[in-house]
Curated annotation (Swiss-Prot):
Disulfide bonds: none annotated. PROSITE patterns: G_TR_1, G_TR_2. It comes from Aster yellows witches'-broom phytoplasma (strain AYWB). It is found in: Cytoplasm. CDD domains: EF-G, EFG_III, EFG_mtEFG1_IV, EFG_mtEFG_C, EFG_mtEFG_II. Catalyzes the GTP-dependent ribosomal translocation step during translation elongation. During this step, the ribosome changes from the pre-translocational (PRE) to the post-translocational (POST) state as the newly formed A-site-bound peptidyl-tRNA and P-site-bound deacylated tRNA move to the P and E sites, respectively. Catalyzes the coordinated movement of the two tRNA molecules, the mRNA and conformational changes in the ribosome. GO terms for cellular component: cytoplasm. Residues 8-282 form the tr-type G domain. This is Elongation factor G. Belongs to the TRAFAC class translation factor GTPase superfamily. Classic translation factor GTPase family. EF-G/EF-2 subfamily.
Length: 688
């Protein structure tokens, strides 16, 4: 099957935003206006096409990223709708890794919110060009100018309006195009019909001002435009459009549009902006990978190059089994062909190739550069793995995911549940890199860990609904961590000789704090005092010992371990002996490395009416919260603080009580910090 759309006519975009900004509603309107669906489903009715999971429909939120494809003005647009809730940021992160552009949706009344900042930061890490859609212009308190100001103040970006609203709240009924210098008035039908009209006379002055501001902002980024502007030459709409596209592709400028997805106003104009300003796969930089010798390999994104793709998501489909979602960066692949998983060094066979629409699917025979599809039949591939044509060794940069911060113990209710639970949890962990399953060695309990209470609630619900596993759960526990704060050198020596062949392993290790960089192992052995074949065993021994902790049994993080000396025995040395010796060396850091317990700190934002500001601040302070700032919003105050997770259990109920149910809050993991001495002593005592 030949390619249907050229690379230039392809767009891979994501819809990203804070929860309740209207992402899924916006995606539904895109699908409706592009003819992908013929009846609009509403999120609040549980009828959204993209929110296909039962839990999504019941809760009215997006939990998993859903992929679909739409067509607009002879362009193919692959769309991924992502969650806005902080517990599911992994879905945003892995989607952005494979997308070329994004539409950031913000609420016209609230402006930039905490999760907007998080998804914006994630998109910036991957250098994803974005257009910004200020949604809910029909909402009480909607303020387009305020929303743009929050973009500049809170995100610190070059963002300018390329549209201006005609009216707001109930009177929002049109959009002025600052590029074409015309206006579009809507009638109130679901078709987003309307007509091009001249700019209303009472808005002519502000239109000229805002167009001038747009040109001034762009001229600082575009030398040709600056010359025209300084010489007061007329700037055509075509020239302005080209300048916007160029700056947007460089992610140095972000055009701002407005509308109301729910009322079908502005979505078609936003689709035009996706085609006009967001990149095609051939507009983005060449993809760089490395071979097994760490030599750089470049793929420029052509169908003629060898097949190279990245697996970014794994999920279990009740009808076809394991589905692996992947993005093709070069070359093409046919259903039934064999490829290499270069990350794991294994051979995989591509079964059926599927073009997804939420949870429905359409089979295709061949896929090309720039395509985002799902494949059936991959056995060993997991999120972040590189797939390449046979004989290729390229490995693309993988993805990093945050560590879980909250844990609960799960116990199967019956023997039948016990048999099914292990398989079910393994499948769920394979799908979600921020969900972890492990056993408590002391109690024998199965522990599941995730990014928040909602995250784990959804996991338990999926166990029941999808896998028919009934389980009892304990109260949530904080996922504390341990680390060392002082560099130290320790010796680990393991000798067992009781007749016959013995065991001999001997290492000298240097352990150093490694803040924010995780575990790092360095081999500094010279002269073969520890033979090369035993070095991996030393590393493995340390990694296994890190998982068990040295103070209270919590995982040790952010440590650099250097093997610099040791000895061996020609006959008695073995891998197991060196593993044990390495773990003994790590345990010595309990007395020499000044170990501490780390607790997860949450970034909390509470939005409350003015009357309750004192109550909210007093309560946050009593929870060991550190106030960062407070900011006036429309008829409310936003209070931001860093608070230990251990102090936030049950906070929703207390906040409701303190504010008569009129305040809202959101929290997300910020960092790990050293726990106070009293908390540390209490934790160690409990774990003793």
């Amino acid at each position: 099957m030949a390619r249907q759309f050229s690379l230039e006519k392809t767009r891979n975009i994501g819809i990203i935003a804070h929860i309740d900004a209207g992402k899924t509603t916006t995606t539904e309107r895109i699908l409706f206006h592009t003819g992908k669906i013929h009846k609009i489903g509403e999120t609040h009715d549980g009828a959204s096409q993209m929110d296909w999971m039962e839990q999504e429909q019941e809760r009215g939120i997006t939990i998993t990223s859903a992929a679909t494809t739409a067509f607009w003005k002879n362009h193919r647009i692959n769309i991924i709708d992502t969650p806005g809730h902080v517990d599911f940021t992994v879905e945003v992160s892995r989607s952005l890794r494979v997308l070329d552009g994004a539409v950031t949706v913000i609420d016209a009344q609230a402006g930039v919110e905490p999760q907007t900042e998080t998804v914006w930061r994630q998109a910036s890490e991957y250098k994803v060009p974005r257009v910004i859609f200020v949604n809910k212009m029909d909402k009480v308190g909607a303020d387009f100018a305020y929303a743009i100001e929050t973009l500049k103040q809170r995100l610190g970006v070059h963002a300018s309006a390329i549209q201006w609203p005609i009216g707001s709240e109930n009177d929002f009924n049109g959009i002025i195009d600052l590029v074409e210098m015309n206006a579009f008035e809507y009638d109130n039908t679901s078709q987003e019909t309307g007509k091009v009209v001249s700019i209303p006379s009472d808005l002519e002055s502000i239109t000229q001002t805002k167009r001038k501001e747009l040109i001034e902002t762009l001229s600082t980024l575009d030398e040709e435009l600056m010359i025209y502007y300084l010489e007061e030459k007329p700037i055509s709409s075509e020239m302005l459009k080209n300048s916007i596209r160029k700056a947007t592709l460089q992610a140095s400028f972000f055009p701002v549009l407005c509308g109301s997805s729910f009322k079908n106003k502005g979505v078609v104009k936003m689709l035009d902006a996706v085609v006009d300003y967001l990149p095609a796969p051939c507009d983005v930089a060449a993809i760089v990978g490395f071979d097994s010798d760490n030599q750089e390999i470049v793929r420029t994104g052509l169908d003629e190059e060898p097949f190279t793709a990245l697996a970014f998501k794994v999920m279990t489909d009740p009808y076809v089994g394991k589905l692996t979602f992947f993005r093709i960066y070069s070359g093409s692949v046919k259903a039934g062909s064999y490829v290499t998983n270069t990350t794991k060094g294994t051979k995989e066979r591509f079964g059926r190739l599927l073009q997804m629409h939420a949870n429905s699917r359409e089979e295709v025979k061949e896929a090309y550069t720039g395509d985002i599809l799902a494949v059936v039949g991959l056995k060993a591939t997991t999120t972040g793995d590189t797939l390449a044509s046979e004989g290729q060794t390229i490995i693309l940069e993988s993805m990093n995911f945050p560590e879980p911060v909250i844990e609960i113990a799960v116990e199967p209710k019956t023997k039948a549940d016990q048999d099914k639970m292990g398989i079910a949890l393994a499948k769920l962990a394979e799908e979600d890199p921020t969900f972890k399953v492990f056993s408590n060695h002391e109690t024998g309990q199965t522990i599941i860990a995730g990014m928040g209470e909602l995250h784990l609630d959804i996991i338990i619900e999926r166990l029941k609904r999808e896998f028919k596993v009934q389980a009892n759960v304990t109260e949530p526990q904080v996922a504390y961590r341990e680390t060392i704060t002082q560099e130290t050198e320790t010796e680990g020596k393991f000798i067992r000789q009781s007749g016959g062949r013995g065991q001999y392993g001997h290492v000298w290790m240097r352990f150093e704090p490694n803040p924010g960089k995780g575990f790092e192992f360095v081999n500094k052995i010279v002269g073969g005092v520890v033979p090369r074949e035993y070095v991996p065993a030393v590393q493995k021994g340390i990694q296994e010992a890190l998982a068990g902790g040295i103070l209270a049994g919590y995982q040790i993080i952010d440590v650099k371990a250097t093997l610099f000396d040791g000895s061996y025995h020609d006959v008695d040395s073995s891998e197991i002996a060196f593993k044990i010796a390495a773990s003994m060396a790590l345990k010595e850091t309990k007395t020499k490395g000044n170990p501490v317990i780390l607790e997860p700190i949450m970034d909390v934002e509470v939005v409350t009416p003015n009357d309750y500001v004192g109550n909210v601040i007093g309560d946050l302070t009593s929870r060991r919260g550190r106030l960062e700032n407070q900011e006036s919003r429309t008829n409310a105050v936003a209070i931001r603080a860093f608070v230990p997770l251990s102090e936030m259990f049950g906070y929703a109920t207390v906040l409701r009580s303190n504010t008569q149910g009129r305040a809202t809050f959101i929290m997300q993991f910020a960092k790990y910090e050293k726990a106070p001495k009293s908390i540390t002593e209490e934790i160690i005592k409990k774990r003793a």
